[in-house]
C-alpha cells in the first residue's frame, strides 16, 4: 500500500460522493451522538464566516431542529459563537453565514482582552511571543470559550476538521484541533463545497479564499500560501489521483510533520513518532 493509499484509508475519503447522501449521513450522526448521551442537549460551534464552520453549523442546526421535532424536547439547542479578536475584517461574511445557518442562539465573545492579557503575562515573565505563536494562542482561546459555554449549557463542542485540513495538519493543536465531534471528517475541500451548494448557501460563503487569519502581521494569509500547495492538489491527492511530484512531496511532508496532532499525548507505548 502506498502512503497515498494509506492516508486515504485513514481519513476515509471517497473519490466521489453524493452530497445529499452525505448531508443525511452527517445530520443522522450528529443526532445519534446526542441521543446516545442523554445528558447532552446542545451543540456549540464557533462561526468564522468561512466554508467549514458555515457547513458544520448548518448541519448541526438541521440535526438539532430534527431532534426537537422528533422528541418534543425544546432543550435541544444549537449555539453559534462569534469569537472575533477585536474587529474581524470579514465580519460581513460571518453575519452572512449566521443568516444562512439561522442558529437557535448566537453568542459573541471577543477574545482580544484574554489573548492580549496572556501575551502580556508571558512578557512579564520574560517570554517574548512571536506573531505565529500568538496566532495559536488565539485559536486556543477560542476553544476555551467554546468549552466554557458547552460546560454551562450541557453541550458538546463541534470541530470543523476535514480531510484536506487533517492531511496537512493545518490546525492548532488543542486549539481548533480540540473538539468533541467532527462531522466533516472524511470530506475534502471540494466535497464540503458541494454540500453547501446543495444546501443552498450563497456562493460567497464557499468561494471565498480560505484563511486561518491568525497572524497580526499577515492578516488574511491564504491557506494555500501558508501551505505551499493548492486545495485542488490536496483534494486530487485525497481522491487517489496523480498530481505533480512537487505537490505530492509537499503534502506528504505536512502529513509527517503533523502526525503528533492526530494523536492523544504520546505515551511510552506509542511508536508512530519514531
Swiss-Prot record:
KW Protein biosynthesis (keyword) present: no
Alphabetized GO MF terms: ATP binding; glutaminase activity; metal ion binding; NAD+ synthase (glutamine-hydrolyzing) activity; NAD+ synthase activity
Gene expressing this chain: nadE
The protein's role, per its UniProt record: Catalyzes the ATP-dependent amidation of deamido-NAD to form NAD. Uses ammonia as a nitrogen source.
Protein name in the entry: NH(3)-dependent NAD(+) synthetase
Residues where Mg(2+) binds: 52, 165
Key words, A-Z: ATP-binding, Ligase, Magnesium, Metal-binding, NAD, Nucleotide-binding
Binding of deamido-NAD(+), residues: 140, 173, 180, 260-261
Subunit structure: Homodimer.
Classification of source organism: Bacteria, Bacillati, Bacillota, Bacilli, Lactobacillales
Pathway where it operates: Cofactor biosynthesis; NAD(+) biosynthesis; NAD(+) from deamido-NAD(+) (ammonia route): step 1/1
Coiled coil start-end: none
Amino acid at each position: 500500500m502506498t502512503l497515498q493509499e494509506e492516508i486515504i484509508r485513514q481519513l476515509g475519503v471517497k473519490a466521489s460522493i453524493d452530497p445529499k447522501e452525505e448531508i443525511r449521513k452527517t445530520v443522522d450522526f450528529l443526532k445519534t451522538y446526542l441521543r446516545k448521551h442523554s445528558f447532552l442537549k446542545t451543540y456549540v460551534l464557533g462561526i468564522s464566516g468561512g466554508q467549514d464552520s458555515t457547513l458544520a453549523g448548518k448541519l448541526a442546526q438541521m440535526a438539532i431542529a430534527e431532534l426537537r421535532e422528533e422528541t418534543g424536547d425544546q432543550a435541544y439547542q444549537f449555539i453559534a459563537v462569534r469569537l472575533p479578536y477585536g474587529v474581524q475584517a470579514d465580519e460581513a461574511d460571518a453575519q452572512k453565514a449566521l443568516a444562512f445557518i439561522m442558529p437557535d442562539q448566537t453568542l459573541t465573545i471577543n477574545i482580544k482582552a484574554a489573548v492580549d492579557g496572556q501575551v502580556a503575562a508571558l512578557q512579564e515573565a520574560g517570554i517574548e511571543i512571536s506573531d505565529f505563536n500568538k496566532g495559536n494562542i488565539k485559536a486556543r482561546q477560542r476553544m476555551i470559550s467554546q468549552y466554557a459555554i458547552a460546560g454551562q449549557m450541557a453541550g458538546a463542542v463541534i470541530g470543523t476538521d476535514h480531510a484536506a485540513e487533517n492531511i496537512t495538519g493545518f490546525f492548532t493543536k488543542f486549539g481548533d484541533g480540540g473538539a468533541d465531534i467532527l462531522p466533516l471528517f472524511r470530506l475534502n475541500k471540494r466535497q464540503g463545497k458541494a454540500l453547501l451548494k446543495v444546501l443552498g448557501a450563497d456562493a460567497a460563503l464557499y468561494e471565498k479564499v480560505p484563511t486561518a487569519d491568525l497572524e497580526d502581521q499577515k492578516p488574511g494569509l491564504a491557506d494555500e500560501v501558508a501551505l505551499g500547495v493548492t486545495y485542488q492538489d490536496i483534494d486530487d491527492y485525497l481522491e487517489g489521483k496523480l498530481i505533480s511530484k512537487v505537490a505530492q512531496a509537499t503534502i506528504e511532508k505536512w502529513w509527517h510533520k503533523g502526525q503528533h496532532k492526530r494523536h492523544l499525548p504520546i505515551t511510552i507505548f506509542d511508536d508512530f513518532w519514531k
